Amino acid sequence: MRESLNKSQIERFSRQLVLKNIGARGQKKILSSKILIVGVGGLGCPAAENLVRAGIGTIGLVDNDIINLSNIHRQNLFTSKDIKKSKVSVAAKKLREINPSTKI
């Protein structure tokens, strides 16, 4: 954890770096953290998105479900064009677009 943040990380996470309780040391911990989200639905979607935006290093997603029309209004990673696709596949693709540095 001795590596310093690179220029891109400093720019991306600048608002977190100024927080007293996070700073560079905390951000490095976030970047090296691993999370498993079981269920990419009404709670899993926003949790995954916020964790990726915060800079979590690795996120695992588990959900055997497909996207239905009834999911669209409450599961922010999915749109109408995603109906009948795997929740995990679509969520992983969208999360990579948000932060390509996070391993999904």
Predicted regions and their residues:
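Adenine nucleotide-associated cytosolic modules
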Residues: M1-I104
